[in-house]
Amino acid sequence: MVQGPNTHRNLDDSPAGPLLILSPCAGTPTRSPAAPDAPDFRLPCHFGRPTRKRGPTTPPLSSPGKLCATGPRRVYSVTVCCGNCGKELTFAVKTSSTSLLGFEHLLNSDLDLLCPRCESRERHGKR
């Protein structure tokens, strides 16, 4: 339901998908041939807040240049809304672009990530 002053616009009441921003972190070295950059995914947050892309994050140290069956692995910064309160959660993942697309599909269809506060409430049965 949309609340606010009377307007002459017809607003869509259906919620949009979750916020999902997947982008490669800057300065990630790889030992394999250069792969084309994965696209920067921007989907609207279902809580109606505008999306804001943050700067590159410093990825955690790990074994460099690993290759997996689906191609070279790179570090990506992921920003998604909490499934309960809508707070932005940002974390880094290291994967191939093919696996990243599968992760995007999972986040858009069946998986809700929770912030620490909402996770604690769910664990203790509070809503």
UniProtKB/Swiss-Prot annotation:
One of its GO terms (molecular function) is DNA-binding transcription factor activity. Keywords: Activator, DNA-binding, Early protein, G1/S host cell cycle checkpoint dysregulation by virus, Host cytoplasm, Host nucleus, Host-virus interaction, Inhibition of host innate immune response by virus, Inhibition of host interferon signaling pathway by virus, Interferon antiviral system evasion, Metal-binding, Modulation of host cell cycle by virus, Oncogene, Transcription, Transcription regulation, Viral immunoevasion, Zinc, Zinc-finger. Its main location: host cell. A motif (Nuclear export signal) lies at residues 100-108. The keyword Metal-binding applies. The keyword Zinc-finger applies. GO terms for cellular component: host cell cytoplasm; host cell nucleus. SUPFAM superfamilies: E7 C-terminal domain-like (SSF161234). Residues 2-56 are annotated as: E7 terminal domain. Highly phosphorylated. Residues 23-66 are annotated as: Disordered. A zinc finger (unnamed) spans 82-118. One of its GO terms (biological process) is symbiont-mediated suppression of host type I interferon-mediated signaling pathway. It holds the Pfam family E7. Belongs to the papillomaviridae E7 protein family. The E7 terminal domain is an intrinsically disordered domain, whose flexibility and conformational transitions confer target adaptability to the oncoprotein. It allows adaptation to a variety of protein targets and exposes the PEST degradation sequence that regulates its turnover in the cell. Homodimer. Homooligomer. Interacts with host RB1; this interaction induces dissociation of RB1-E2F1 complex thereby disrupting RB1 activity. Interacts with host EP300; this interaction represses EP300 transcriptional activity. Interacts with protein E2; this interaction inhibits E7 oncogenic activity. Interacts with host TMEM173/STING; this interaction impairs the ability of TMEM173/STING to sense cytosolic DNA and promote the production of type I interferon (IFN-alpha and IFN-beta). Plays a role in viral genome replication by driving entry of quiescent cells into the cell cycle. Stimulation of progression from G1 to S phase allows the virus to efficiently use the cellular DNA replicating machinery to achieve viral genome replication. E7 protein has both transforming and trans-activating activities. Induces the disassembly of the E2F1 transcription factor from RB1, with subsequent transcriptional activation of E2F1-regulated S-phase genes. Interferes with host histone deacetylation mediated by HDAC1 and HDAC2, leading to transcription activation. HAMAP family: PPV_E7 (MF_04004). This is Protein E7. It comes from Bovine papillomavirus type 1.
